[in-house]
């Protein structure tokens, strides 16, 4: 279980709304040499194309490094364009339009889950156990099935929808991927609900980016706001996040499953919010029990070490501890270690046949660098 950092009236907690304070690793009980050695390994290319490493401890930056990769030249010799926002276009990946906004890919899903929690707390969504298809009256599935009608918001958050879906057995550049086909379609929601059901909802985990798009539509339908606008008003403004970009689908919905672009420092704010149980300063941004519920009833995944919560991966470590992992294609990783007061962010673009940064390695490097425990 997560042992969340206490946030009750502790005036010593630093809230980086206006920006992160920078300090030394040693002053915050971490070994700088260990962090530097890991950074050097990342920069060498041994673990693929890494764009940045950022480590927060006790609410301060203790290590930060960005690495240079010549994606313009690389894209000229690899792949073909695929989709409107293809993976081989340097104007879209890994940075947005020559800015420092980095693609988050499926890390976007964790933000979407937070929006659902806020909407439930605000009364826009009745509960986690509400039937999600009740909000899709404008759509009619070409594969009607009572199992789809029984699907709850909780089932969608935990990727146990029961929908027949495959996006993990092939590269994301493969046109037979359900995710790619969805992104190539004119109406992503219609594509998702047209897929046949394979299981009872809640029965089996199956990673499904289309499920997260259902949540985007749900937010729009229940709050009257596009997801991007809802997140801006109810999340980003509290955290002081002003510089971002979010892609939209052909029908105008926010691309909730992979369309967010952020700077690493702003992504770390989101992790810091979860580290502090959804509280930011004197403001309870997320429902008080939302972070706890994120991992309270984890589902098993196809990887024995990983479990899945509300659009977050859960990684056990130490004696009965759990790290939160927000993960996205290409090497986007944010690891939250509440017991150690650490948030670590890694960005990259490892979509090629190269070794890649492993989440367990990244987590263990952070744990091993702690010298005050």
Language-model-detected regions and their locations in the chain:
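Active-site Gly/Thr loop motif
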Residues: 241-244, 291-345
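Active-site SXXK
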Residues: 59, 82, 89, 100-128, ...
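Active-site helix/loop module of the DD-peptidase/beta-lactamase fold
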Residues: 92-93, 98, 122-163, 194-196, ...
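A small/polar active-site loop signature that marks catalytic segments
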Residues: 162-248
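Active-site-proximal alpha-helical segments within enzyme catalytic domains
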Residues: 211-218, 258-279, 332-348
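N-terminal leader/targeting segments and the immediately adjacent pre-domain N-terminus
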Residues: 1-96, 122-125, 186, 190, ...
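Short clusters of small/polar residues that mark proteolytic maturation junctions
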Residues: 66-67, 130, 338, 348
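Structured C-terminal helix/loop/strand segments within mature extracytoplasmic catalytic/sensor domains
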Residues: 326-373
């Amino acid at each position: 279980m997560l042992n969340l950092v206490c946030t009750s009236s502790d005036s010593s907690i630093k809230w980086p709304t206006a920006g992160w304070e920078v300090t030394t690793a040693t002053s915050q009980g971490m070994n700088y040499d260990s962090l530097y050695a890991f950074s050097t390994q990342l920069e060498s290319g041994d673990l693929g194309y890494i764009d940045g490493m950022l480590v927060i401890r006790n609410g301060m930056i203790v290590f930060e490094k960005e690495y240079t990769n010549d994606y313009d030249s690389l894209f000229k010799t690899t792949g073909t364009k695929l989709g409107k926002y293809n993976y081989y276009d340097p104007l879209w990946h890994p940075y947005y339009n020559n800015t420092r906004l980095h693609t988050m890919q499926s890390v976007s899903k964790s933000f979407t889950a937070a929006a659902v929690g806020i909407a439930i707390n605000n009364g826009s969504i009745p509960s986690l156990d509400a039937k999600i298809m009740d909000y899709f009256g404008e759509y009619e599935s070409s594969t009607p099935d009572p199992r789809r009608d029984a699907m709850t918001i909780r089932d969608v958050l935990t990727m146990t929808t029961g929908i027949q879906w495959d996006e993990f057995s092939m590269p994301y550049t493969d046109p037979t991927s359900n995710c790619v086909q969805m992104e190539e379609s004119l109406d992503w929601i219609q594509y998702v609900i047209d897929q046949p059901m394979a299981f009872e909802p809640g029965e089996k985990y199956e990673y499904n980016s289309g499920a997260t798009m259902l949540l985007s539509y749900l937010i729009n339908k229940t709050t009257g706001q596009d997801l991007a606008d809802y997140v801006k008003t109810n999340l980003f403004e509290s955290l002081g996040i002003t510089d971002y970009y979010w892609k939209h689908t052909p029908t105008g919905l926010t691309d909730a499953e992979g369309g967010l672009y952020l700077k690493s420092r702003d992504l770390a704010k989101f992790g810091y919010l979860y580290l502090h149980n959804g509280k930011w300063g004197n403001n309870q941004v997320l429902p008080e029990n939302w972070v706890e519920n994120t991992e309270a009833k984890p589902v098993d995944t196809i990887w024995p070490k990983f479990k899945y919560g509300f659009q977050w991966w859960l990684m056990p470590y130490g004696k009965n501890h759990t790290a939160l992992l927000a993960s996205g294609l290409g090497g986007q990783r944010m690891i939250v270690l509440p017991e150690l007061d650490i948030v670590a962010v890694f960005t990259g673009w490892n979509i090629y046949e190269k070794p890649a940064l492993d989440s367990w390695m990244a987590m263990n490097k952070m744990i091993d660098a702690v010298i005050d425990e």
